Structure formats: structure tokens, C-alpha cells
Amino acid sequence: MIFANHAHVFPEDIKPSGTIDNLKRLMDDCGIDKAVCFAPFSDRFEECGRTDTPNEWLAKAIKNEPDLYGFGTVDFTKNLRDEVDRIADFGFKGIKMHPPYQEFDIDGEDAFKVYERAEELGLFITFHCGMHWHRLKGVRPILYDEVGWFFPKLRFSLEHLGGYHFFNESLAVMCNNSRGEVRPRVFAGWTSVSDCEGIDAWTLTNEQLETIISQTGDESSMFGLDFPFHGAEYIKYEMERFNSLNISDTAKENILGETLRKVLGV
């Protein structure tokens, strides 16, 4: 079974290429069985004048989609504990957080409120990890070590694992949080790391991908789509690339779905 993380989905009036139907077509084309869908960030709904919330929309959109699992979004202008509670009430498995885009500090007081409640409720968090055209001071990957330190039962993924610029820093966070009662709890998100379109901000080499496995083990990595920002050819290339790496068959199975399945309990 192939189970992919990291699909950004949208109502058609906000981003036509990012609809649930288009995601399902891509999954069929690529042979992907299940996927995690992220609710859009709240500013996208506000810009379009929608009266529903992103989490309300996503809950309705995937209600009858047994192969799609929801991750909610947090609106930092609202009561954060209530925001996380509503995400759990919708039956979502986790939260998508993007420090540069949402403009919050990884180790900030507001963010810690989200982590605390997510830990209490057993929600997984998928973080953007790496540069994204925002001041780096509050969003450097090393700050995720603070999340691991203060919330030892919280499970989360570092998507792109820092990318081209912050790979070693992100890997250090994973390795530094590899002990404790909950293991593994910091995961590498193998998302948008391809070299098929040249070297960009999130590209990782085969050697770096193999290093993730050798340093953190077979059960700490998971594959992500970054839909709709990549199409079927890109996704197929990545899946073939991962299967060609000099790592165990067990590691490959885990990357392409088994780790995510276990983490989310589905």
C-alpha cells in the first residue's frame, strides 16, 4: 500500500488545480492508495470572502472519501486551544503548520500553545522545514529541537528536512530527539526533494536521503506529494528514485506508506 502525506487541497473557487477530484486523479495515475489532505491556510479563505472555515470545508469535502485523511490548520488570530480542539472534533489526524507562511516563530509562545494541546490530544503535526522567503531568525530548523525538548510525546514531521540549505541542521534535530519514551517521534518528510527539475531550495541528493536512513533508522521517514504543486510525472520520478536507493526493502516500504500508516493508526 502506498500512503502519501502532504497534499494541499482547495475549493475550486480558490485553486482549481488543487481540488479533491484532481488529487484523486493524480493518485490513480501514480498508483497511490491513500493520502493526507491539508486544509488551506485561513488567509486563502479570507481573500476569497468565504464564510466557512478551511477546516469546516475540508471535513465536508472528505467526509465520503475513505482513502483521504484530513490535517487541519490553525488560525493564529483565534483562541489557539479551541482551534486545536476543533481540529480533533472534526476527526482529523493532525495539523499542518508552516512557520514562514503563517508568520509565527517555531519556539514562540503562541506556537507552544498549539503544540501543548496537540500533544495532549495525540495529534500529529506536519511542519514546513526550510527557507520560504521570510526572516530566518524565528523559523530556522534548529528551533524544532525546542519543540522536541519541551513536548517529548508530540510526534511531528520536518517536511523537506531543511532542503538544500538546512539539511544537516534538520538531521541534527531528528538525531537529537531519537531517545525517550516515544520513538520515533521526529520524522523526515521526503517531500519536493527531487532533482528532476534541477537544484532548487528543497532538493536533496541520493546520498543525503540514504544518510537519513543510516542516521535515523528505517521507520523515521515518510513520502509526501506537495500536491498540486507537482504533477504525476514528478511524483512517479520520486517514487522510482526512492526505490532505487541503497537502503533496505523495509525502509522503502516504510517511506512509501507504512510509517505514515502506523503513525496515524489507520
Model-derived regions, located:
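Divalent metal-coordination and catalytic microenvironments
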Residues: 6, 27, 35, 58, ...
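Alpha-helical elements of Rossmann-like donor-binding domains used by nucleotide-donor carbohydrate transfer enzymes
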Residues: 22, 57, 82, 86, ...
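Mid-to-C-terminal alpha-helical segments outside catalytic/metal-binding sites
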Residues: 1-7, 16-34, 85, 217-220, ...
